[in-house]
Amino acid sequence: ELERSRGNKDIDWIVVCMHQTAVSTGNKTNGADLGIRENWLPLFDRFNVDLVVCGHEHHYERSHAIRGTLPTDTLTPNPVDAQPDSIDTSKGTVHLVIGGGGTSIPSNTMLFPEPRCRVLMSVGELNPATGRKTPNYIEEAAPWSVFRDRENPCGFVAFDVDPGRPGASTTMDATYYAVSGPFGEVRAVDRFRLTRPRTDR
């Protein structure tokens, strides 16, 4: 599907929606998943995926554009564009964790103080007391991290796409709105713009 979409001149943007994450700065939460980094990130690079939207973690955070991985056991995603708010996705894929749509267990207060990441490397034997397999984690630095909402447990992202003109670029403006208070006060907390050349160039 990714190959067909990227080869279609009528499609500019490729957005992947999935549950678990390749990136997360949550501590004592689910964390990032090595299996996703091994199996999915190379596909996202190969087919120039623009944006990956995940849940699983119950907070909001955003990565720099990433392409490839650093030479670590955890396959740390490699940030390729230091621009925090205007990102050319032809250089790399931006990852969003949007997990604050409504949960009884928010994780925004469980983020590492500095950008770090726990990566699920494998699972061990079944623990009869819990009925679950024991997860094995490795902690790493998170150079890919650009924005984390530590204050607000609930929120959503609105996207506005401008197709642009033939032969030029197309843009996707995104705004993360935090929702708080007993009356659902909505406040913009993070804004960024993705750009890419149109495929009809």
Model-identified regions with their sequence ranges:
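Metal-dependent phosphoesterase/phosphodiesterase active-site architecture
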Residues: 1-16, 21-30, 34, 38, ...
